[in-house]
């Protein structure tokens, strides 16, 4: 029944009601985003409402280089979303955002450092495989992972050649001060020296 309404009427309804979910009920309606007068971050809306099927559809449109992508995908907003999902560790969403064009290298590889800080090893590995630099910002990733006791992240970073002794064994001391014995033990086994205060 709804698909019997002319597109012009749908545009008026959406503009009046401000309900973008009306455009998400049908793939044909989705293209009406080009015509509506609503300023909204559709990617953020789709993710917040856990509409993964819609996100899949947007990714498919991106791969097809559909012109609607230019209206609904704004790189700055993608980058903001990417940081948020690196904090929460949602690898599935991180992958979608990268496919849609989020810049994993922005702000000295902030997203990989954020994932390290929060202990999301699978997100870290994915971002590194996509070209993120775990040594950016003076090897900050290992300091953040050590400080928060994320042993698996620390082990991964060391295996990738991150310099954990760069600042007079700062990482091991921070891990020790925060009570992360397993990180301390690992770094000592790799040659770090714990400095007493």
Curated annotation (Swiss-Prot):
Magnesium recorded as keyword: no
- Spell out the SUPFAM superfamilies in the cross-references: Ankyrin repeat (SSF48403)
What keywords would UniProt list here? ANK repeat, Repeat
Q: Which domain of life is it from?
A: Viruses
Ranges occupied by ANK repeats:
78-106, 107-136, 138-166, 168-196
> Which Cys pairs does UniProt list as disulfide-bonded?
none
Query: Record's InterPro entries?
Result: Ankyrin_rpt, Ankyrin_rpt-contain_sf
User: What is the name attached to this protein's record?
Assistant: Putative ankyrin repeat protein R875
Organism listed in the record:
Acanthamoeba polyphaga mimivirus
